[in-house]
Amino acid sequence: MKIEARAPTRIDLAGGTLDIWPLYLFHEGAQTVNCAITRYASCRIETHRGPGITLVSRDTRRSETFASLTALARARRYRLPLLAHLVRYFQPRSGFTLTTNSEAPAGAGIGGSSAMAVAICAAL
C-alpha cells in the first residue's frame, strides 16, 4: 500500500513567536497572524511485508533503517528524530518505508518542521 500526504508551510504576518512557550506566559492574550504558502512538506509511506522500518529524508539526504518497531523504540539516538518519534507514537503494525521531502529550507522559519509533522501524522 502507498499513502501520500503533504502540508503547507506558513509565514508570520504579525505576532511572530508569541504563541510559543514561554513567551505566551508573559503576553496574555497575544495573537499571531499566519498564512499558508505554496512551499510544502510531504511524505510517502510504502508498506511491505516484514517488520523492518526505513526512514528517508530526501531534502536532508539522511536515512536510517530499523529491524522492527521494537528496535526503533530501543534506539538511543536517531538520525531523523522527528520521523522516529512520530513512528514511535503511532506504533504502526507492519513494516514500511517513510520518505519525506521539504520544499522549505531548513531553518527558514516558515514552519517546515511543523508542516512535516502534520503530513506524517496524516499519513500514519
Predicted features, each with a name:
Residues 115-124:
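Stable alpha-helical structural segments in soluble proteins, enriched in small hydrophobic residues
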